[in-house]
């Protein structure tokens, strides 16, 4: 009965003044929410879905909407102005909308050719800090799928060709009417390729590609960092049935270095020096990443942990003429396993020492003395 039907405007959750774009937007939103495929086994969602379709079919048509606004549901009852109808026109418009909803329209461009792009490949390579400093050309061997030479990647035996799929006509997808709406799915006859192979190539079993080891040259530029990615276009997995190949991505990682630590373009190192060298001062010689040596002047009275900068002795900056710096941190080494004579000399040195020779220690103990002296007076 017409009296049991909900108002079409209420069904689409829009005002009576809603324009075409508002109606379409509301329909898309509700159709997506209540589509049976998104609510399997829910009978109420299927019923709601039908109501939404019926309401939209009427309100999107100017003449039907005018009749509905004037007579309500009675306009489409037996003998009225004509029912909403769910013929071929509805199936077409409904299908177009769902192509937008589920992205089907964008997929059509690649159908019917049978070609598929090859997958991208990843290769992890570890290099040394020295390699990153000078750059190098490395040779790598990778297992990769290449186009079958026997069939030129078609998958068909020599002298034959793939045939257009008779089930989908080369589209790769088929449409199936279910009641008042149409669903589109991957063609089961060709698995979406649009072509079938009756006589497969014996060399590749119809795949259109075979597995082989391939040697490639990889150019590693100066200044690469840990995690740098190098792309080799077209060196990935071969495409199917003549499709384009994928790309190969080389991911670089830097091995830890026994002497240097890297921070961007700068290099850091720790150099132990004796207590005497720190006290009297002098020069120390340190290795550099370019296999050379640099001298660092250590002033007298240098404390452990002090850093010295050597300009332009770091790493080159990738794709730049700039170069980082090198930082040398001195670590004053406390003598161990002293002889009796050495202990005597150090004890003598301690007796001769004053606050002037050890200002930080003298200042510290003065603060401690003042602290406890203040607390004693307060108590």
From Swiss-Prot:
Gene: dnaJ
Record text on subunit structure and interactions: Homodimer.
Cofactor note: Binds 2 Zn(2+) ions per monomer.
Task of the protein: Participates actively in the response to hyperosmotic and heat shock by preventing the aggregation of stress-denatured proteins and by disaggregating proteins, also in an autonomous, DnaK-independent fashion. Unfolded proteins bind initially to DnaJ; upon interaction with the DnaJ-bound protein, DnaK hydrolyzes its bound ATP, resulting in the formation of a stable complex. GrpE releases ADP from DnaK; ATP binding to DnaK triggers the release of the substrate protein, thus completing the reaction cycle.
Chief place where the protein resides: cytoplasm
Residues that, per the record, bind Zn(2+) 1: 148, 151, 201, 204
Matching NCBIfam families: DnaJ_bact (TIGR02349), PRK10767.1 (NF008035)
GO CC entries: cytoplasm
Cystine pairings recorded for this chain: none
Protein family (similarity comment): Belongs to the DnaJ family.
Domain notes: The J domain is necessary and sufficient to stimulate DnaK ATPase activity. Zinc center 1 plays an important role in the autonomous, DnaK-independent chaperone activity of DnaJ. Zinc center 2 is essential for interaction with DnaK and for DnaJ activity.
ZnF locations on chain (CR-type): 135-213
Residue numbers binding Zn(2+) 2: 165, 168, 187, 190
Matches recorded under Gene3D superfamilies: DnaJ domain (1.10.287.110), Heat shock protein DnaJ, cysteine-rich domain (2.10.230.10), Urease metallochaperone UreE, N-terminal domain (2.60.260.20)
Keyword terms, alphabetized: Chaperone, Cytoplasm, DNA replication, Metal-binding, Repeat, Stress response, Zinc, Zinc-finger
UniProt CXXCXGXG motif repeat ranges: 148-155, 165-172, 187-194, 201-208
UniProt xrefs under HAMAP family: DnaJ
Pfam families the record matches: DnaJ (PF00226), DnaJ_C (PF01556), DnaJ_CXXCXGXG (PF00684)
Molecular functions (GO terms): ATP binding; heat shock protein binding; unfolded protein binding; zinc ion binding
Compartment(s): Cytoplasm
Cofactor: Zn(2+)
Domain J: 7-72
Source organism per UniProt: Rhodopseudomonas palustris (strain BisB18)
Official protein name in the record: Chaperone protein DnaJ
BP-aspect Gene Ontology terms: chaperone cofactor-dependent protein refolding; DNA replication; protein refolding; response to heat
